[in-house]
Every structure is written in structure tokens, then in C-alpha cells.
A protein has these predicted regions:
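Divalent metal-coordination and catalytic microenvironments
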Residues: 4, 20, 30, 81-82
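Fold-independent oxyanion-binding glycine-rich loops
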Residues: 7-9, 31-32, 105, 131
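Short acidic-hydrophobic, aromatic-tinged amphipathic segments that line or gate anion-handling sites
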Residues: 124-131
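Catalytic core of the metallo-beta-lactamase
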Residues: 3-8, 12-24, 133-141
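Histidine-centered divalent metal-coordination motifs
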Residues: 76, 80-86
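Active-site environment of divalent metal-dependent phosphoester hydrolases
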Residues: 13-14, 84-87, 110, 135
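Pre-active-site segment of Zn-dependent metallo-hydrolases
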Residues: 25-78, 92, 99, 103, ...
Length: 141
């Protein structure tokens, strides 16, 4: 059975995140930030470590706690393109999932640049696909 979870970005520009579940496996499309809310949250303080739960409260990143029950089912995080409203939350939220990050060369290079600039280390593998290619993530997906 196919299930779609509208996690974020459906009522605004930002925090884009959708989970598509097929049987007992799922993929997450996008993990973006809401730029205005992120700036409001971070502008007044020198933050040493940004806490994901605080970013959720500030409305800056998708509320992934809504899909906590699916955490172990998510097999891949796939940012659809390199805009921050589609991949900007990956540095803060992706470590909560045991899933590879899969994207095109441009998208993964933008993500790597953000991670390097912000000195963030992810546990997730970043895989680069050629444009217009296909990739089998799991048995169902």
C-alpha cells in the first residue's frame, strides 16, 4: 500500500518535506528550512550548537517528530533540488535517520559545501546520481 505523509511546506514557502511509504519502507523527499523563521531564530544569538527541537519550535524546519513512528522505515532522504527550502534542514535533521542522502551532482555538492562551511558532520552517506538516471533504493522502492 502507498501512503503519503505531508510533513512540511504545504502551507508556506519553506520546510518542504514529504514522506512516501510503500508497504514497510519509505523515502523522504526534501528536508528544507523556512528561511525567514531560521533567520529570526538565529540572528540574535551566537549559537554554538543548533538544536533540532528548537528549530522545530521556531518553525524553521519540518516537524519530523510527526513521523517518529516511521523513523526506522525511511531508507533514503532525497532532496529534489539545491534550494534551501528543499535541503537546508538536512544538516540539522538527517542524523535522526539511518538513511542515505541521494541527489544529483549539483544538489549533493551544494549540500557538501553547506556542511563544510558550517563544520557539520553527518552520519548519513551522500550518494550522487547522474541526472535522468534511476536508482533502486530497496526491494519496494
Amino acid at each position: 500500500m502507498l501512503e503519503i505523509y505531508a510533513v512540511g511546506g504545504y502551507n508556506e514557502v519553506g520546510k518542504n518535506c514529504t514522506v512516501i511509504k510503500v508497504d514497510d519502507e519509505a523515502v523522504m523527499l526534501d528536508m528544507g528550512v523556512h528561511i525567514e523563521n531560521y533567520i529570526k531564530y538565529t540572528q540574535d544569538e551566537e549559537l554554538i550548537a543548533v538544536k533540532p527541537s528548537e528549530l522545530v519550535k521556531a518553525g524553521a524546519v519540518p516537524d519530523i517528530y510527526f513521523i517518529e513512528k516511521l523513523k526506522d522505515n525511511i531508507k533514503a532522504i532525497i532532496p529534489t533540488h539545491a534550494h534551501l527550502d528543499h535541503l537546508g534542514a538536512i544538516p540539522y535533521l538527517s542524523n535522526k535517520f539511518k538513511a542515505d542522502i541521494i541527489g544529483t551532482a549539483y544538489t549533493t555538492e551544494v549540500l557538501r559545501a553547506i556542511l563544510k562551511n558550517d563544520k557539520i558532520k553527518l552520519n548519513n552517506k551522500i550518494k550522487t546520481l547522474s541526472a535522468n538516471s534511476s536508482f533502486k533504493i530497496s526491494n519496494n522502492i
